[in-house]
Amino acid sequence: MERRLFTSESVSEGHPDKVADQISDAILDAMLEKDPNSHVACETIVTTGMVFVFGEISTNAYVDIQDVVRKTILRIGYDRPELGFDGNNCAVMVDIDEQSPDIAGGVDHSLETRENESDQDELDQIGAGDQGLMFGFAIKETPELMPLPISLAHRLMRRVASLRKDHTLDWLRPDAKAQVTVEYDENNNPLRVDTVVISTQTDAEVSNKEIRRAMIDLVIKEVIPARYLDEKTKFLINPSGRFVIGGPKGDSGLTGRKIIVDTYGGYARHGGGAFSGKDSTKVDRSASYAARYVAKNIVAAGLAYRCEVQLAYAIGVAHPVSIMIDTAGTGKVDDDLLTEAVRHVFDLRPAGIIKMLDLRRPIYEQTAAYGHFGRTDVDLSWEKTDKTQDLLDYIKNNK
């Protein structure tokens, strides 16, 4: 097998699509803080001088949405007019409806409880908020069990943001993107980094030479382990030649447009559903988190080198319609036995996921930039590996 290249990208918190994601999740968190049972589907558009928040929300909480929007924008770093977008004076428009009663009926009273009125299992009460398929993935390429390309891309973006916020590089602006191409050997092990692309918004005065030096010396070489860099590694720094106009002034942003950045950088499959702005009754989000939790525990238990999990749901139904485990031939036991173990160890009904991962908390804004998985900078319940022994015990007793 020939060596191959694989590329993943990340974007900064100041990227317009990520600004929208963070606003949607900040609103979700504000709702959950006051009413943990809020049903939220919140979308955001950002463009030059304007934010538009819309969607369907059912809650007992009162939240000053305009205030949440402005505080989020200012936290990201758009805090003065010369950046082309300013949380202090941008227009904020809000158009929120209540959740459809047809959807709410299926969520609050699952098909299982409607067909069997004597069903007293509280975890059967909540039906999935929609149909759909969700994937989770884990692989032993990094300590956090993530693919190396997306892991490095996220770390590059966090480093650029850190240098901006601590004023080490005062000429940096909030918008940025990174892309990392990794070369794999014939056994699919990471061999080296072939190409690094960083495009970062700057002020107009800094020279391209200074930008390049800073990105290579203070970002790339600080983030990417030296063993992956060699004399053939290519560094493409602001290759367009100029990146001064950025953020929502340069491009409009919309919630849910960076779903590959949010997950595994294209290394694993994706069901198509976005995460931000959605409460945990939306299986697009909660089941994707659960699938990652399952996959990570399988790999952490030493049961496979890599693992992809697919879950699928029907609207208004509590139990998943399918569970699939695929270890791509790296499993220590048969994938069918792993699937049995997963059904035994993990409760993958929506209410079971919510309880297992404690998802009614205001924890989501921190996930809306730099990825939802493999995070080492925040504490996320779906990143824990506390089910490994349960999996091993089931496998041992059922071989």
Curated annotation (Swiss-Prot):
Gene3D superfamilies: 3.30.300.10. Residues 99-109 are annotated as: Flexible loop. Signal peptide: none annotated. The keyword Nucleotidyltransferase does not apply. It catalyses: L-methionine + ATP + H2O = S-adenosyl-L-methionine + phosphate + diphosphate. Binds 2 divalent ions per subunit. Binds 1 potassium ion per subunit. Homotetramer; dimer of dimers. This is S-adenosylmethionine synthase. The lineage of its organism: Bacteria, Bacillati, Bacillota, Bacilli, Lactobacillales.
